[in-house]
Amino acid sequence: MEESAVDDVIERLLEVRNNRPGKQVNLAEGEIRQLCLTAKDVFMSQPNLLELEAPIKICGDIHGQYTDLLRLFEYGGFPPEANYLFLGDYVDRGKQSLETICLLLAFKVKYPKNFFLLRGNHECASINRIYGFYDVCKRRYNIRLWKTFTDCFNCLPACALVDEKIICMHGGLSPELKSLDAIRHIPRPTDVPDTGLLCDLLWSDPDKDVAGWGENDRGVSYTFGPDTVTGFLQKHDLDLICRAHQVVEDGYEFFAKRQLVTLFSAPNYCGEFDNAGALMSVDDTLMCSFQILKPSEKKGKLLYGSGALAGPGRGTPRR
């Protein structure tokens, strides 16, 4: 895809910033198809376990809340002003899955070494077939375009490592995650299997009441306890697990004595929750701080706030 064509797509997607929230951006089907194909090539040119450097801003679930995504960028700085890592779940549930995924893919194509997207459990055909994305593609374009997105999603990387100290994924740990090389060796393109390493990385959840591994109420994957987190970090000489996948009231929530953090970046999720959204800024000393999008009393308006500084696990100088 020509750089000028990508710039044009980004420009039109950002034009709605000053419009009423929810205004659709009508890109041509051919443009979206090219965007998917180009992004797919970029994903495949980079490893399944991304190795990234701080400073970087990390965001959790977006779920088609395009207006909130634009506010996150207004707050954290539009690319390439800041480096970004998103932890998956770009589509489904919210009203603007298409605008959301197109802007994220366009930024990935435009800034391949500064802007990173991981795979969430909703970047999977069997899930987004049910929870909204398929219907949106079918209504606004056609099923063929949905299949093009599926092919693109099947190439998304699973995990990222920030300065060899912070491991990031959408869901969580896996009993099959014996070494980080196991992530590097997951084949792509691939669908998300019902069990196994990739499934767990996208689906598992921490649970303070579990020792080791437990059953997951989602009916998929496992839950893992604080002991599992501690053991994993010690074994791999890591400081922090950063994941998304669960709505948390303040936009971020620590677990296992600050050895794991859950990030969620869709405030007022689905219009049903009163949660804040957060992004985590990791500076070049690996100090983590949180920027908060608070839900406001009046729907559609968001307040900005800033969280206290918090070191990951133990304060670590950058290596």
UniProtKB/Swiss-Prot annotation:
Mn(2+) 1 binds at residues 61, 63, 89. GO terms for cellular component: cytoplasm; nucleus. Its cofactor is Mn(2+). Its EC number is 3.1.3.16. Keywords: Hydrolase, Manganese, Metal-binding, Protein phosphatase. Pfam families: Metallophos, STPPase_N. Binds 2 manganese ions per subunit. The active site is at residue 122. Mn(2+) 2 binds at residues 89, 121, 170, 245. PANTHER family: SERINE/THREONINE PROTEIN PHOSPHATASE, SERINE_THREONINE-PROTEIN PHOSPHATASE. Belongs to the PPP phosphatase family. PP-1 subfamily. This is Serine/threonine-protein phosphatase PP1 isozyme 2.
